[in-house]
Amino acid sequence: MTARAIRRCHEKDALMLKPLKPFLPWMLLLAMGLGWGLAFSLAKMAILAGGMPFGMAFWQMVAACVMCFVICQIQRKPIPMTRQAIANYLLVSVLASSVPSSCLMFAAGRVPAGVIAITIAIVPMLTYALATSMGREHQSLIRLSGLFCGIIAILLLVVPSTSLPDRSAVPWILVAAIAPTFHAFNNINLTRPVMAGMHPLHIIFGANLFGAMTLLPLSLASGHMFPLAFPFGVLEWALFGNAVINILAFVGFITTIQLAGPIFASQTGYIVTISGVIWGMVLF
């Protein structure tokens, strides 16, 4: 196929998708929410199947890294390794990969999947708070009211003695809440000019690469490392499923930020909360 024919195909595809463009951010928001909501239940399955937190996070990142590398090679998209690109990978790795994944894995074995999903509602609240404090969004009384209502809702989840079946889970809810806090900072980070020109698959590859490099010694030192079984069992399929979800959802998330901004994209946290609770009820 000639270059002109390929260009015509792209133009034809663009024309076919044009009527859907106004709805695309909403469609992505729903898809991300359903996918990330399932991720908590998959993490719970992996823990129940014998996985250990640091080891689970490590293998999940390795799987995501390998898949992104293969896709980039097939699409002939060379992965940049400049000083600025590496700095971007490291920052996203800390904010969206190694720290959040480890926190969620630790909490998954001690807190119901639905409860962990509820903590994700923190993401849009904190994203809005950060954006307004940095002057990127105008203050709104309605949005501020929503922010305070969200904070009260989280407090109602952990403070009353009857809110949880086991009060020993309270500290682990706070550990789980570290993940959405870091994700909120990453939402703002992804809007920086130095991030704008990077392909989502490159960002995912780099973040998971450096995340896996960080978690490898931690997994070995803590005794959390474990070999993968072949053929795959529940543990391996759960980790592989989470890796696929994270790749697809992160690509959709960056696309949504580019189309509608970080505040809109962060609203997927509410869908994650609802779908996470439903997935937890269905699967457990």
What does each of the following model-derived ranges do?
Residues 56-59, 97, 101, 114-122, ...:
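Helix-helix packing/entry segments at the starts of transmembrane helices
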Residues 41-50, 109, 158-169, 220-237:
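Membrane-interface helix termini and inter-helical loops of multi-pass transporters
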Residues 10-58, 106, 165-192, 213, ...:
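Glycine-/small-residue-enriched transmembrane alpha-helix faces in small-molecule transporters
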